Amino acid sequence: MKAGIHPAYNEISVICACGHSLKTRSTHKGDMRVEICSSCHPFFTGKQKLMDTAGRIDRFEKKYKASRVGKAAPTT
């Protein structure tokens, strides 16, 4: 690598809003603050909110049922 053209690569602390922090290396200067991390994100903590997909499918079928009425089934 050429000397003097690359940014400084330093060890920084990434600090979450929940208080969790971790060390990493980056070209970012100073500490990095984030709103969410793996310690507090619902996907990683298991407190994930599941959507009602069955209800969404029913609404979709109800909405487009009128457009299918009277049309012949596709032939193969």
From Swiss-Prot:
Domain of life assignment: Bacteria
- List the molecular function annotations (GO) for this entry: metal ion binding; rRNA binding; structural constituent of ribosome
Give the required cofactors.
Zn(2+)
Q: Where does Zn(2+) bind?
A: C16, C18, C37, C40
GO BP annotations of the record are:
translation
Entry keyword set? Metal-binding, Ribonucleoprotein, Ribosomal protein, RNA-binding, rRNA-binding, Zinc
Please name the Pfam families in this protein's record: Ribosomal_L31
Task: Work out whether the entry's keyword set contains Ribosomal protein.
Answer: yes
Q: Name one GO cellular component term.
A: ribonucleoprotein complex
Q: What does this protein do?
A: Binds the 23S rRNA.
Q: PANTHER family under this entry?
A: 50S RIBOSOMAL PROTEIN L31, CHLOROPLASTIC, LARGE RIBOSOMAL SUBUNIT PROTEIN BL31A
Q: How does it assemble?
A: Part of the 50S ribosomal subunit.
Full protein name: Large ribosomal subunit protein bL31
